[in-house]
């Protein structure tokens, strides 16, 4: 495992044997594999972007991707079976999207993330091949992870807002497009710009959740208690 997404990470450089938070290696590795597959789903969604407004499955893609990203944030989910279940779903969703993409005559790049097939028996092995450190360039790796953590935070806001029936498809589409960029882009300048753009969209996600809470529960104000 290798995880450095929180400020408590071992020695300030990264957890390699187990998470300071209590996350075990098999969970960290499973989360890496899930994120890897989400990038493939993001790419397929982007290739089919002309379908974004009318495809009946698009909202399901948005919901799954947000839920999956949310499940990998710090201290959110240490259940490897739960992450494996999401990997199962990601593979099935990817294959359906891939079939639709081929049906539409859209060219699909020859990438492992779009073709790899595996069962739970090999998830752990595959995860060690595509983790954070599989990117050899430290600068590119750092930028991509910074953006990834931004997407995870956005997904958390969006999931909470969706529970209150507040959904912004534009933000969901941004997440899909950015996942695709994380898969394909290795230009530091472009990734730096993308990190800044992700921050802008993160503020929009925060505003959506704030609106959802305000509409549902009214503005926060002090109350007297009987204590």
Question: Where are each of the predicted segments found?
Answer:
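Conserved small/polar residues in nucleotide/adenosyl-binding loops
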Residues: 218-225
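Often metal-dependent polyanion-binding catalytic scaffolds in large enzymes
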Residues: 1-216
């Amino acid at each position: 495992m290798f995880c450095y997404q929180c400020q408590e990470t071992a020695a300030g450089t990264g957890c390699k044997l187990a998470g300071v938070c209590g996350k075990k290696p098999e969970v960290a590795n499973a989360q890496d594999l899930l994120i890897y597959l989400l990038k493939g789903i993001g790419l397929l969604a982007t290739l089919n972007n002309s379908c974004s407004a009318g495809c009946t499955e698009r909202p399901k893609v948005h919901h799954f991707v947000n839920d999956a990203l949310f499940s990998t944030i710090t201290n959110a989910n240490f259940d490897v079976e739960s992450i494996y279940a999401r990997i199962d779903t990601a593979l099935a969703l990817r294959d359906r999207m891939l079939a639709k993409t081929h049906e539409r005559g859209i060219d699909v790049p020859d990438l492992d993330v779009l073709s790899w097939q595996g069962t739970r028996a090999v998830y752990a092995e595959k995860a060690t091949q595509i983790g954070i450190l599989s990117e050899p360039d430290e600068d590119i790796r750092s930028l991509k992870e910074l953006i990834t953590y931004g997407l995870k935070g956005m997904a958390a806001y969006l999931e909470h807002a969706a529970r209150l029936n507040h959904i912004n498809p534009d933000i969901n589409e941004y997440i899909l497009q950015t996942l695709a960029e994380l898969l394909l882009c290795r230009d530091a300048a472009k990734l730096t710009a993308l990190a800044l753009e992700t921050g802008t969209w993160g503020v929009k996600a925060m505003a959506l959740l704030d609106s959802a809470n305000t509409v549902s529960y009214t503005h926060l104000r002090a109350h007297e208690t009987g204590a």
